[in-house]
Amino acid sequence: MKKDIHPKYEEITASCSCGNVIKIRSTVGHDLNLDVCSKCHPFFTGKQRDVATGGRVDRFNKRFNIPGSK
């Protein structure tokens, strides 16, 4: 194998917005900031959170106050 052709593979810290800190090994070279991780993602926690508060049709009906809409 050739020497000195592989990228540096070092330990970095991945910090989640929920406060969870994960140490991983990567070639990125700098620490990462994550939006979600396995500690706070709804799939892993079993908690469902309502991200979308309504579809486009609901917003249209609400904006123009169409009778028969929600």
Curated annotation (Swiss-Prot):
Residue stretches spanning the membrane: none
Gene Ontology MF terms: metal ion binding; rRNA binding; structural constituent of ribosome
Cofactor: Zn(2+)
Pfam families hit by this protein: Ribosomal_L31
Residues noted as binding Zn(2+) in the record, renumbered to the chain: 16, 18, 37, 40
Cellular compartments per GO CC: ribonucleoprotein complex; ribosome
Record-linked SUPFAM superfamilies: L28p-like (SSF143800)
Cofactor remark from the record: Binds 1 zinc ion per subunit.
Residues with the N6-acetyllysine modification: 8
GO BP of this protein: translation
Function: Binds the 23S rRNA.
Family statement: Belongs to the bacterial ribosomal protein bL31 family. Type A subfamily.
Self-association state and partner proteins as the record states: Part of the 50S ribosomal subunit.
PANTHER family in UniProt: 50S RIBOSOMAL PROTEIN L31, CHLOROPLASTIC, LARGE RIBOSOMAL SUBUNIT PROTEIN BL31A
Name of protein: Large ribosomal subunit protein bL31
Organism of provenance: Shigella flexneri
Gene name tied to this protein: rpmE
